Structures are given as C-alpha cells and as structure tokens.
Amino acid sequence: MKASILTKLETLVERYEEVQHLLGDPDVIGNQDKFRALSKEYSQLEEVTKCFQAYQQAQDDLAAAEDMANEDDEEMREMAQEEIKEAKEAIERLTDELQILLLPKDPNDDRNCFLEIRAGAGGDEAGIFAGDLFRMYSKYAEKRGWRIEVMSSNEAEHGGYKEMIAKVSGDGAYGVLKFESGGHRVQRVPATESQGRVHTSACTVAVMAEIPEADLPEIKAADLKIDTFRASGAGGQHVNTTDSAIRITHLPTGTVVECQDERSQHKNKAKAMAVLAARIVQAEEERRAAEVSDTRRNLLGSGDRSDRIRTYNYPQGRVSDHRINLTIYRLNEVMEGDLQSLIDPVVQEHQADQLAALAENG
C-alpha cells in the first residue's frame, strides 16, 4: 500500500479516537446539534478504522509467520507457510476494502430522495408499467425499512400513472437509488392484446436528492409562476371542488412541478417547492458533472432521461442492465422489490471506475 494512503489512514484513525473522546465530553453531550454531528462522523470513521486495524493486524501476523518460517522445526515451518498464505490473502482483501472506503463520497448519498416516474412511449401500457415500477420501488423501500410517500401523481386512464413523484425517506436512500435514473423499457404482451403480440413500451425514472433546508438554493419569488387548479383523477374528472392543486414554474430554468395529492393548497405548495429545489440543484450538479467527465462514462446517466439503462422482458423472464452488460433471469423477484442483485453490480462498477480515475491521476 502507498505511503500516502497509509498516512491518510493513520490521520483518520487519530480523528476517530479524538471524536470518540469528544462524545464523552459533558459540554458536547449538552449540545444536541454538535453531539448529533459528531455521532454521524464517528459512525462514518468507524468502518474505515476497524478495517485499517484489521489490516495492521494482518501485517503483524505476516511478520510473525515469516519469522516462524526460519525455525529449525519442519512442522513449525509448514505451519508458518500456511499462516503466511492466509495473512497475504487477508492483506490483499483488506487493501481492496480500504481503497473503496477511501473513495470520495457523494455528500448527497446519506439523504432522502425524490423518485420521479414518467410514462413514455407505449400508450396505456407505458402508464401501467409506470405503476408497476412504483410498486417495485415501494416493495424495495419496505424491505430496506424506508418510508415512501406519494408527493404528486397523475393517474393514467387504464391504471398506473402518466407521471408521479414519491419521496423516499431512509438512511442512504439517495446513495442506493441514484443509479435508477434513466430509461426503463418493458417488453410484454399487454392484457388488452388479443393476438398475443409482445409490445415494447418505456418509462423514465429520475432520482433526486432531498435538499436540507440549510442548503436550499435561493429561489426568488419573482422567478416563480404559481398557478392553482382543481385536482383531477384518472380520465380528467375533478376529485374536489376547491383549487387546492398547485403548479409552480421556475421561469429561469423552465422547471415545472405540479402537486395535487393533498387537500390543502398550502401543503401542496410546500411539497412542490421541495421537489422544485431538488430538481434545480440536480440539474446544476449534472451540468457540472458533464463538464468534468466528458471522456469518462457516467453510470449515473445524463440529464437526458431517455438514456436506456434497463430492459424488463416478460416472455423470457429476464432483466438486462445495458450500462454494465448484465442480464439476470429473475424478473418476478425483481418486480417484487428484490433489486439488490441489480443495484450492487452497478455500484461495484462505479467504484471500479472511480479507482481507475484515481490511478490515472496518480
């Protein structure tokens, strides 16, 4: 392992011990904000510290085994060779783990997120599939112990959604779901298809980090156009008699957010503003990322949500992720919320790309 990496790890361990000491300080315990911030830092440092301590122990074990390999006793030498092999394997594995733990963290990864699903090409079937995707993500959120809440929805006439936005609340929700952004294509025989022909339709998914109040961008009232209207259900029928639904247009960027799920206009406006802020910040981050990663592929997809990332093929029972050439034949399980087998390989590929970029930059 490089000396520069070892120095960085030693610094992190020192900070871990310092934070551990501070958490026992009565002044810190009495200051809720400070205690919360230090507790979070402590939990972030704990994993890398424990891993580095295991690495150091493996190095000590290797040195001891190499000494033992020089013994006169043949049985001791054989035992030493076995211990040397085990220690070297542990060092290699822990080195890889430490490199991943030291990769730059996306500051948004720990945050809640907004999940936006829009029906694309494919008519009624696209709307039905948008509903299927929302159910899939809801099931996945349930397995993770996250809470999912519909912020805004526009139901399709034959089931599902024309478009919908949900808030996913839970530890690391954005970091896990951010790779879901992009085009999702479905190939199946629609329930209305009498000839048994397979149809292709598509939906787009966008995942945006929820922005904490302290980090919200300044949005001037003069830059907003706010319209109120009556909430409507599937087929356009009005579902209440007051103008409680809200449409907010951010004039400088042309970003539009609608919210009509609450009966209160005030609540709909608050929800719409939260989504608007997330969209504005996301667009700016995507613009910056595009500037620095023209040459390197970006598994997070581009601002163009039509980038096809995944195909769900019902006749073959398969799901394919086009970004990493992965195909699994577990469609039913995936649609029931078993997404980890699709998410983990993309995260691993992203980490491999980050490691390659670090190696290129020395």
Curated annotation (Swiss-Prot):
GO terms of molecular function: translation release factor activity, codon specific
Gene3D superfamilies documented for this protein: 3.30.160.20, 3.30.70.1660, 6.10.140.1950
PROSITE patterns in the record: RF_PROK_I
Primary location: cytoplasm
Record has Protein biosynthesis as a keyword: yes
Cell location: Cytoplasm
Post-translational modification: Methylated by PrmC. Methylation increases the termination efficiency of RF1.
InterPro entries given in the database record: PCRF, Pep_chain_release_fac_I, Pep_chain_release_fac_I_sf, Prokaryotic/Mito_RF, RF-1
GO cellular component terms listed in the entry, alphabetical order: cytoplasm
Stored Pfam families: PCRF, RF-1
Keyword Protein biosynthesis: yes
Keywords: Cytoplasm, Methylation, Protein biosynthesis
Domain of life: Bacteria
Residue positions where N5-methylglutamine is found in the record: Q237
Similarity section: Belongs to the prokaryotic/mitochondrial release factor family.
Function: Peptide chain release factor 1 directs the termination of translation in response to the peptide chain termination codons UAG and UAA.
UniProt-recorded name of the protein: Peptide chain release factor 1
Gene: prfA
